[in-house]
């Protein structure tokens, strides 16, 4: 009985959030919180989907002759089912054996409160799932292509793809939404020291994106310019220049947040500024 496990990291965007939806770059950093996807061949005559992290549970299903999942319970519109089905539809396989599929995002939740951090768990899990499905079933598709198709179907194609790219590449990257511009690897300025803080309050990314219905406002234009400016100084390798430009970018982000009523700095983030 074979077992294959693949993991992928979450991410934190240093600069370029929202601006990357247009033509500006995003600077994104992978972090050591990983989603794990495992496929285990077993001798039960049923497929099992085990979820760890988001509402721990096990779901049973079969696959019909058309390659469609048929769940054995009657709960409708379960987000986990919908997410899993999004990937399954992309590959449309009919397994010749039975498997246990384990999706583990427990590292993306606060151990005390149980709240989600908001550091790209769905993208990390999508990349891990794409990798483990391709490896297990020898699929003729790349991890990037399968992960992007799955994630965009699940999110309604509203995201930029930066979280998928970060989970795939690791490290720190400069990412453009336009596919013609290649993602490039970056290094932090030498001797730069930093800490990552979590406000303790989760925010819905789809809800935030729904408020940005037009890119015509002045604050969005300013945010784009500052995202481009900030990305341009990478490689200069001076901490002062890095921090000065990051301060300017943060000011532009605050202006954008107020004009679009996003409350980006409302959950105690402003205390750190």
Write out the residue ranges for each language-model feature.
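Residues at secondary-structure transition points
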Residues: 22, 59, 124-126
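Domain-wide signal for the mature, well-folded portions of proteins, strongly enriched
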Residues: 114-117, 163
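DPxDG-like acidic metal-binding loop motif
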Residues: 117-142
């Amino acid at each position: 009985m074979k077992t294959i496990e693949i993991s992928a990291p979450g991410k934190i965007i240093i600069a370029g959030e929202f601006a990357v939806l247009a033509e500006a770059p995003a600077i994104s950093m992978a972090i050591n919180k990983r989603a794990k996807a495992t496929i285990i061949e077993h001798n039960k005559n049923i497929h099992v989907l085990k979820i760890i992290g988001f509402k721990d549970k096990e779901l049973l299903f079969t696959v019909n002759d058309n390659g469609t999942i048929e769940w054995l319970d009657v709960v409708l519109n379960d987000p986990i089912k919908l997410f899993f089905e999004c990937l399954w539809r992309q590959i449309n396989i009919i397994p010749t054996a039975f498997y246990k599929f384990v999706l583990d995002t427990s590292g993306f939740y606060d151990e005390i409160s149980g709240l989600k951090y908001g550091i790209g768990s769905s993208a990390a899990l999508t990349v891990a799932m794409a990798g483990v499905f391709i490896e297990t079933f020898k699929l003729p598709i790349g991890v990037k292509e399968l992960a992007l198709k799955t994630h965009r179907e699940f999110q309604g194609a509203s995201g930029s793809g930066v979280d998928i790219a970060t989970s795939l590449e690791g490290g720190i990257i400069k990412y453009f939404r336009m596919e013609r511009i290649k993602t490039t690897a970056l290094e932090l300025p030498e001797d730069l020291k930093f800490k990552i803080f979590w406000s303790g309050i989760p925010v819905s990314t789809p809800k935030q994106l729904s408020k940005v219905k037009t890119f015509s406002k002045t604050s969005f234009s300013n945010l784009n310019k500052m995202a481009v400016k900030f990305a341009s100084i990478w490689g200069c390798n001076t901490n002062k220049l890095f921090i000065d430009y990051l301060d300017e970018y943060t000011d532009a982000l605050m202006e954008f947040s107020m004009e679009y009523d996003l409350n980006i700095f409302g959950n105690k983030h402003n205390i750190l500024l």
